[in-house]
Every structure is written in C-alpha cells, then in structure tokens.
Amino acid sequence: MFRENFSNSKVHLIGPLQSNKVKQAVELFDAIHTIDRLKLAQKLSKEIQSQGKAPEMFIQINTGEEKQKSGIIPSEADQFISDCFSLDLPIKGLMVIPPINEEPSLHFGLLKKIAHRNGLTGLSMGMSSDFESAIAMGATHIRVGSAIFGERDYS
C-alpha cells in the first residue's frame, strides 16, 4: 500500500535486519543501512542474485566499540568491506550511531576516514540530536524521525 500511494519515494531500512527476513527486506527496501555481520552479507548476496534486485547497502560500523550495539568494529572494517565487495554486494557506504555520551563529530570523522580509504561515498550518520554536525562532516543520509514526528512515547 505504501508503494502504491508513494511510488516515487525511496524506502530505507534503518533498523536491525534478522537473517530470516532477508528475502522480504530485498523485496521491500531501496536501501538497507544495517549490514553488520558476514552471515547477513552472505544471505543478502544470495537473495539479490535470486531476485535480481539490489537495494543500496550500508555497512554499520560500531565506532565506539560498544558491546550493546551491532556493527563492525573499526579495526575489522576494511576486511569486512572487502568481504562484502567479494560477495558482489552493492555497498554504497557506511552507517554509524555514535555513543550517546561522546562527541558525535569524532565518530563521524572516523566513519568518513574508513569510507574514504575504501572508496565509499555514502555516509549514513546523524540523528535528530546531531544531524547538523553530521551534515557538516559530509553525511549523505540522516535519520531525523524524532525531529519530524516528536519523541517516542515509551509509556
């Protein structure tokens, strides 16, 4: 229904992707911003070949090396990016969500360096609270749901 009403819109997956939902994700989304493990990359590669449809892909980098967050740690990023290219994944860029109590621009800068040395132009970084800094650092995609729709109600 969304596609029928908004046929010119691009739909991006910005949340975690479970391996068992890969088929639906490739069918539904124009971009996937959370490639965070080799098993997922391998399944996406097979599904893209099967469907003949290739959403843009962003690899999630855990620049803060936070245990509670998904993503590839910076020291393993170059190898993971290479692995994804060898799977013929259409990697557009990298994505980061900085640690909440740290200066986001440091993490945006690190993401930009990793992207640059791997020939990637897409930078998915910045949320409602820090998107200005992300844009200043070269973000190509930002997530501003709270700024548009208001804060979430967790009650």
Describe each region flagged by the PLM:
Residues 1-122, 127-129, 137:
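Conserved alpha/beta-domain cores
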Residues 2-6, 132-155:
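C-terminal helical cap(s) of enzyme catalytic domains, especially alpha/beta-barrels
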